[in-house]
């Protein structure tokens, strides 16, 4: 006979013999069919809405919802796209989602402790006996159902539920911190790759200008105006420019690979995806919105890593209450219904019906002092969580102060790097005009060109350092959102 058919007959027989259990049995057996996905069945409402609707980042008006088709290798990658990919593909972010699901499941278990539990069973007995007077055969089936419900436990379930609730909030805050860290990492890697590409382009311009200087030196030598040493110096400069360009190309490729790894894209393809970065518009910076004390005060109150550590401390304190309550009395109620006798006691008489209702009071008297040590361990865990909170606060505030110093330094260097580049460009133009008419030698021309190369690289580094530090400052303060990327990148 089909197992499902046997189960249905068993439950129907118990329900008919015990009418009060009918509603409970129907609710128990039909509940899993309410959701298409078993993991989404949440009758106790323990699952946070972020798991179904997505995450809302600071300053955003749209939820973060990841899609498997969001990455296309042929698409030009801007900063917002890079951040979105990091938020969806990075293993650390995916692990934070799993941690939320785990804590939600534990919260559901804690809430389930307030509900009764129902179990049912069946047994079949066959008795074949024979004697000098003949033989007999007897077959009887036994059905039973038991309902148990904890009525009183002196606060243990309440403390356990509060701890689970706080740990879920800690998991949500930890995920916020993981998202901010992922965005900060993506911003740094993106601007490293962007800076490497700009450096490669600067080396290409330097090589083109060096070749122009070489052509001019060759023509001057052919006309008898220049000398062979000048031509050789120009050739040396071209060879050096080619070497520096080759190194810049290698650094650019390395930065793109590091960006792909940091965004978690290597797991999406068999090879390293070919990334193409968008061009950044150079605009005048607007400066920092707040001073360092304001940033630090905001981080102390709202940084997700600090909020998560505080929640861990609160959960540890609730665990102390749980440990203490386990040594207190508990009161349970049980109700059982037996049809055709009790199980494991041989076959009863057909048609027998028995109902048993009872209260069970359990009073722990002596546990070998284990309860004392368990409470001491719970107190020690509170001290450990408090120390971890202080460590997280120091780490967050220290990183924020360092990033603020980097941002202010990069902001001050922007104007200097622009002036340096403008002066170096005018110097090259002036020396080149003089060199074309024979009023300057090759050494002066090459020195001016080398100074221009250095000025271009300094400008590239200054812009990259400012944009990266500005956004990392937002992330280290726990305030970065996708909507703020475009505006913040121009400051």
Regions found by a protein language model. Give the residues of each.
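Terminal intrinsically disordered/low-complexity segments used for targeting and assembly
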Residues: 1-85, 249-297, 475-491
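Metallo-beta-lactamase
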Residues: 248, 304, 311, 462
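Amphipathic alpha-helical coiled-coil segments
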Residues: 95-110, 178, 182-205, 212-214, ...
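Transmembrane beta-barrel architecture of outer-membrane proteins
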Residues: 102, 140-142, 188, 233, ...
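Small/polar, glycine/serine/threonine/aspartate-rich low-complexity segments that form flexible
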Residues: 64-75, 121-149, 276-289, 321, ...
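A glycine-/polar-enriched beta->alpha junction
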Residues: 84-94, 101-117, 145-163, 173-180, ...
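"Short basic amphipathic alpha-helical interaction patches in structured regions
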Residues: 99, 134-139, 159-167, 342
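Periplasmic alpha-helical coiled-coil/stalk elements that build and connect Gram-negative outer-membrane
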Residues: 166, 173, 177-298, 403-406, ...
């Amino acid at each position: 006979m089909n197992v499902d058919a046997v189960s249905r007959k068993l439950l129907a027989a118990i329900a008919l013999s015990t009418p009060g259990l009918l509603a409970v049995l129907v609710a128990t057996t039909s509940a899993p069919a309410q959701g298409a996905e078993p993991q989404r069945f949440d009758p106790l409402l323990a699952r946070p809405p972020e798991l179904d609707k997505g995450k809302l980042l600071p300053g955003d008006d749209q939820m973060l919802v990841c899609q498997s088709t969001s990455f296309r290798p042929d698409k030009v990658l801007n900063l917002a796209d890079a951040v979105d990919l990091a938020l969806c593909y990075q293993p650390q972010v995916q692990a934070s989602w799993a941690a939320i699901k785990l804590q939600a499941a534990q919260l559901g278990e804690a809430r389930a402790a307030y509900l009764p539990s129902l179990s049912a069973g069946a047994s079949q007995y066959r008795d074949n006996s024979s004697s000098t007077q003949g033989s007999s055969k007897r077959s009887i089936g036994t059905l039973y159902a038991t309902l148990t419900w904890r009525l009183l436990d002196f606060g243990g379930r309440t403390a356990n539920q509060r701890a689970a609730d706080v740990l879920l909030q800690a998991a949500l805050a930890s995920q916020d911190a993981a998202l901010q860290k992922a965005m900060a990492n993506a911003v740094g890697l993106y601007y490293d790759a962007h800076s490497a590409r700009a450096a490669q382009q600067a080396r290409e311009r330097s090589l083109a200008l060096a070749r122009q200087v070489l052509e001019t030196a060759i023509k001057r030598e052919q006309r008898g105006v220049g000398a062979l040493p000048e031509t050789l110096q120009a050739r040396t400069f071209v060879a050096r420019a080619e070497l520096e360009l080759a190194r810049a190309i290698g650094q650019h490729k390395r930065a793109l690979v590091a960006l792909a790894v940091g965004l978690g894209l290597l797991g999406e393809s068999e090879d390293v995806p070919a990334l193409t970065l968008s061009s950044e518009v150079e605009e005048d910076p607007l400066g920092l919105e707040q001073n360092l004390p304001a940033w630090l005060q905001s981080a102390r109150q709202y940084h997700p890593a600090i909020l998560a550590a505080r929640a861990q401390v609160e959960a540890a304190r609730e665990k102390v209450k749980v440990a203490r309550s386990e040594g207190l009395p508990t009161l349970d109620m049980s109700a059982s219904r037996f049809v055709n006798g009790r199980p494991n006691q041989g076959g009863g008489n057909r048609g027998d019906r028995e109902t048993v209702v009872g209260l069970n009071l359990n009073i722990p008297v002596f546990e070998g002092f284990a309860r004392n040590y368990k409470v001491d361990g719970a107190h020690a865990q509170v001290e450990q969580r408090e120390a971890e909170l202080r460590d997280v606060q120091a780490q967050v505030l220290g990183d924020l102060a360092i990033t603020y110093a980097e941002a202010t330094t990069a902001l001050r260097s922007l104007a200097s790097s622009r002036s340096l580049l403008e002066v170096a460009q005018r110097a090259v133009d002036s020396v080149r005009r003089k060199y074309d008419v024979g009023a300057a030698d090759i050494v002066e021309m090459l020195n001016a060109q080398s100074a221009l190369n250095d000025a271009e690289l300094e400008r590239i580094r200054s812009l990259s350092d400012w944009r990266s530090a500005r956004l990392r400052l937002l992330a280290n303060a726990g305030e970065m959102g996708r909507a703020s990327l475009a505006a913040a990148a121009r400051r």
